[in-house]
């Protein structure tokens, strides 16, 4: 804002100045001396001193020497302009009265003189539709300001001064300026950026609670210093205190255990609470800042597997968690920190294997070229509700599957065994497959069995017209040599062979 310092025209004295009168005398009135200084004489022809005189609707001041003051303070409360008239309803940028005689002082400040000419001081005042604050000496306040009740305002630059509202990008305040915020720029452990976004309500009060706030229909997160938080945020609640949301990267013990505390807001230019899909770097506090992955957020919280035993992949040498979660009618897989997973995944809650394509969508039916242990296999996933997407176990369209994986011989034929029930005591069914996984059931054909122990060109008996080998006709040696299936995950970090889970 550029304040306009209005110089009023003096109807009597100023008119004489304009006409260049050399010396004008009145029975009672104004008189200009040879030095060009105006004086006022009363009806007794006495020079008036130390008084205000009104002329043409304006007030003028005669000092102790009877000289009309110009561009000067009067009693540290009033100010007369260059024409000598008292300033009324007017801004003036000048030195304080006590500093006027110090030519080296450059500490000018703005003052406002009201309808009676007195400076406004130790108060707030609405001027031209905007609210300003003045200190006990009448100086207009600017920048960060904290009132006696601990409310924090921002009053613009030194030539602005009006109380701000809405969003402002500002340098973080010094602790001395705003003690209520407790922010210390010199403290390396301070959680604020040097600059950031701050929110000021319509009454100018800054929001300074470590919590979320709805602004113009969107939620934003703030720390206890009032600075808006953005991107990853650790919203851990400290015992006995309100929410103490802090920026990511300040957790004492980073790792997956922090996932439940993490929130996400948009980048600093936006900042509102995230909803929907985001492809972003992970949080420092979950040790994932070097990884870029897809996350799905609802109210700022990532959809994720629970950091608990129910979602833990128990057969993995490393702690891994997986959950199958529906998003907008489609199924996706997420780990314990919310990273979307692709490829073959074991879902503990369903006790089964599922496949998620490169875009994260769960697949059903036949899926070829599933990577596993430096090889690729064909899988089949259920298409029926109730088991939708789960890897099929047993016979399917003339092929043999286990947890979705098609069981095949390496070159010739191989005997596989699958459990009959949920307990090992229930026994096994035995099957014969070729290198394409096709089930065999010819009792007249001789088969080269690659997993046999010294026997080839074997004929088998089958149970009726089924694909099951007649186990009563199988030798103990053949049963012992029958292959059991396995599935490898996580680049060989985990191997699944558990029939009875």
Please annotate each region the language model reported.
Residues 2-501:
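Extracellular adhesion/carbohydrate-binding repeat motifs centered on closely spaced tryptophans
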